[in-house]
Amino acid sequence: MKVLDACGILHSDLDFSNEEYYITNEVLAEIVNETAKTMVDHGIYTGQLKIRDPTVENIAKVKEAAKKTGDLTRLSGADIGVLALSLECGAEIVSDDYAIQNVAASMRLKYHTTAKEGIQKEYVWEKTCPGCGLKHSIEFTKCEVCGTRLRNVGKKIVKE
């Protein structure tokens, strides 16, 4: 069983015939490429690709995990839905998105990529001011002390 995100569909040659695939309504709305849309529509029509949205509880769990890794601001609603549905179903995620992969790794969810190499290390991100060196929560964009634009810095490597 696999949960697909938009880039997992756009950069793959899935035919939906050999496994059970799921997509959320938000991911479905992101598919605007005509070729990919035709492939997705065919998968839905044949019943090999199912549309399912995650529960609010699993969305909350993913948001909490993404806050801990510092990836929350990098994830779209569709990305969060993909992670939450994977958590809910125990399904493998198909995505080339590094933020999805990082959060999935932190939650011990399985994932694989389609077009590019996946993450090599799992990071926890934080915002640091290059001006005064003060560390900030990931939600901030400017330093509260000196007003300098903050930089994302990998705080620690969780696994190698």
Whereabouts are the PLM-identified features?
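Feature 3881 marks metal-assisted phosphotransfer/nuclease machinery
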Residues: M1-A84, E88-C89, A99-E160
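Short glycine-rich phosphate-binding loop at a beta-alpha junction
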Residues: E92-S95
